[in-house]
Amino acid sequence: MYQIPVKNLTKLRRPRKRVKSILCDIGMQQCQDMLETYKCFDAGDASFDNTEWDDFTDGHVGKKKKKYPYRSQSLCCSLCWYSSRSVPTFRSHIHRCHWKNLDGACLLMCPYCPFVSSPKVTEQHIQFFHMLPSRAHQSHPSHTLAHTPKTISVTVSADAADDRYTCATCGYHDSLLYVMKKHVLVNHFATLLDRYFGLGSESAPMAGPQIRDGTPVKYHCKLCKLPAETIEHLLYHILSSEKHKELHWQIMPCIIEKECMNQMVGLQNLLNLAPKSMQPVTLFARPNYMPQQTQQTNGNGTVLLAGPSNAAALFCSPGAGQMFLSPQTQALLSGTTVAALQNAPHPQSPGGMSQVLPTSPVVKPLNMVMPNMPQNTPKTLPLTMTVPRLPPPQQGPQVLLPPGVQVNLPGEMGVHSPFLVTQGLQLNQSVPRAPLITSQSVRFIPTGNKVNGVPTYTLAPVQVTVPVHGGPPQMVLAQNQISQPPNSAVVTPGLMPPVQRAMNKNSRPNELAVQAPFLKKHDNQTVKCLRCKILLTEQGIFQHLLHGLKCLFCPQMFYSFKQIMEHSKKEHSLKVKDNRLYIKEQFSLDCDDEGNLIFSTFNLNTDVPKDLLDNRELNLALVTSTKDKIYIKMYPDKAEYTTMLKSAPNACPFCQVKLQNPEDYELHLQTKHHIVPTIHAILKTPAYKCIYCFGVYTEKSTPKTISIHVQRCRCAPKAVKEAERKLNPDTSESHDGDVCSSVQMPASEVTFQGAPEFPKPKKEAVTPRNRRRNTKASKTGTLVPETPVTLVLEPMGMERTSFEDRKDFLSQYFHRKPYVTKTEIELLASRLWINKADVKAHFNSKLTKCLKAIQKKRVCVRLGFKMIEVNKLKHNLFIPEVKPVKRKDPNEVNLSSLVPGVTVKTEQVDATTQHPLFIPEVPVTIKKEEEVCEIDHGFIIQEVTVKQEEVDEMEDALCTNG
């Protein structure tokens, strides 16, 4: 812990075991040298035996502390031999095996360096090496996996109500988890991002210049060396890849979900249209806004508040005679007009008439119809307010409030929610000091825009009851029927843009031209998705556009219509002549002089949720990889694009069990099916994920496929696996890995209630080329019948053994049959529950080792024969049986071996006796000629029969040698 953090720790861990063994050898050698040095001072064993001393090992049990072998992984369990590189895998191991001692097995990773230790030690390590003096007082919620921030930002705005996630450090909020993770990683974990983010220049010296599609790669991932064309690609890979799953658990502590935000100050007071009378008005604003001074009602005067510094609203108070002008309004008016507005007297009419608010003609007028009611009778009048939508460059809201009304206005950032105004509106009836009573809660509608990452909202239509006195039988308050009082301040209409121009600009559809390389145009009404390999319909095409839209001018990819529209307007505006010429030459897209795309016709018309299209129509021109153009007209639908489950189903889609509430539904899925409902990260469709390994199932999974996955899941507990094997035994014969493929089933059995249902895609058109291909495939299928495959070794019961045992079985199978067919590999993979790629790689590695060994080593084969078996063969060869010769002492002279024993006739004895080389010691047997037999002796020639003629020749030879 007290060592300075070292970089390139992965390279140091590889030779660490070897270095440790070398140091042990060096230490042993030093001990031996020291023993030799002091050997002369040794008094002997007698002195050692006669020495007495106290045993210092008293109390030692004799058991040595268990020392685990060296583990090269970064996360090592201190309670057993287990080690892992992935944080989720290590966490699941602790929960499965050491759930009774979680505190002792808990580890914590340093967010700045690869240091890993217990939480207390890691906190000290961070304070010693990574804590800057200027940031010593700040809290670090990213240092622990289960840390809850002590202080929460109290600056809450109305747009945070629909956002599910909030940053615990800076208060940034969004409804998408990916956006929040990206924000935390880029803004609060810059050091951690540097471990993954790499430029193309950094990877060039290591792996050479990386070139992809003819262009050099700009970015890459430092850990897995994945190249990326843009920063968005690299960030998406870092945050969503399973290889970097440990990054998720370091970022999530900085993200607070909506359930954790219920204690934030001001969340329950987002907007209150009916406060109690005679109460001070409070204003909750963001840090860059200061709370304004509040006023109470005096008589029948109107209580109005000064808005934020950037709100384009004109407020007046008749009782106090004060008027507040926003900076934007002051900029539009001259200096004399501003002084006249601020200093002008505002007398109150006897009948309780409110002051006239001259407003901008940007907003539609408000028509109020007063029903007929008796005189002097307080009644409630339902008042429906419709909120029009303003584009960002237009002026902000202007508010007219009748006397006796108090409003709490939350401060907002950027584009503000437009409130109801009318041009020169007067209320000629007397209004008592009674509060407004809202008949329903306030609801916000997202506009689709974001300012500094903060989404903007507008008010939904609200019904309120206004206590008024009776008046004429029917009174219609409209713009053309309202007269202005003589002492009212009126803004010159020439200073404001015309209403018609603003309405035309707001109602004009957006235009966009992008590349969609994954689409293929079949005809004018048919489009095929090459990635999903299906034909697309009009209603479901926008789901496939989320695969990624590429800019026409740069290689950036986008996964949202709003993002690519904003990028195109800022970076590649078609108002520039060069950009118009470029798309006309490269993609044959026509534009007018103002930079608007020309759409002569549309191939497809579809409805898209309005929160995806900025609540405006979109004319989309898609350019495919073959430069074909697809023109689509997109209409904003009323239904919002749901990013989360709005209504949980009350029946399980797998076992049809009726449930009462969403909590029981999720608990049932977790306990019985081991899954939880989720949303697909890219397609934004309902899906399920495993509670052990977080793997996402397709929406057409069955209970059988889920059970098989749980049996093979490496993160699932053993008890759960055994229970699933008993309930649903795996009898399938074709699996492609640990996660089995989902079986197709009707969509009605799995889809959620309330989820969008899309019509089935059309069948692919049959062309002559496809027909020839199909007929050719059918012919080949009939000519080649499938033959049953027999395995050399039967893997009976091996699928439930360990992975090493199954590899040993594959090695034995290789020794029996090194060259296997494709069908054998598939059968072995299905029988052993191993991936086909792993089986094939195992056989290839074994074969490669054998071939290399044959090339390097010279093999000598010695052939031997069994003589017993050879003698049984029938042949014409004569193979004599030779007895082995006994070796004798060379110093001992055996005379019998010099001259062999000779058998002669009786009449030849005298002649033999007179021979000069006759040796008397040689035994001579004299027998009759008919009784002459063979005599054995120790000479090399074992059996000799000598005739008289041969004896004479022998004598001559002996004489010659002598």
UniProtKB/Swiss-Prot annotation:
Residues 753-781 are annotated as: Disordered. This is Activity-dependent neuroprotective protein 2a. GO terms for cellular component: nucleus. A zinc finger (C2H2-type) spans 75-98, 108-130, 165-188, 219-244, 527-547, 549-572, 650-673, 688-712. PROSITE patterns: ZINC_FINGER_C2H2_1. It is found in: Nucleus. It comes from Danio rerio (Zebrafish). GO terms for biological process: erythrocyte maturation; regulation of gene expression. Disruption phenotype: Morpholino knockdown has no effect on overall morphology, and at the onset of blood circulation at 24 hours post-fertilization (hpf), blood cells are present, however between 33 and 48 hpf, blood cells are absent, and embryos develop cardiac edema. Hemoglobin undetectable. Some embryos recovered blood circulation at day 4 after knockdown, whereas others became severely edematous at day 4-5 and died by about 7 days. At 28 and 48 hpf, expression of band3 almost abolished; embryonic alpha-globin1 also significantly reduced at 28 hpf. Keywords: DNA-binding, Homeobox, Metal-binding, Nucleus, Repeat, Transcription, Transcription regulation, Zinc, Zinc-finger. The lineage of its organism: Eukaryota, Metazoa, Chordata, Craniata, Vertebrata. One of its GO terms (molecular function) is DNA binding. InterPro entries: ADNP/ADNP2, ADNP_Znf, Znf_C2H2_type. PANTHER family: ACTIVITY-DEPENDENT NEUROPROTECTOR HOMEOBOX PROTEIN 2, NEUROPROTECTIVE PEPTIDE-CONTAINING PROTEIN.
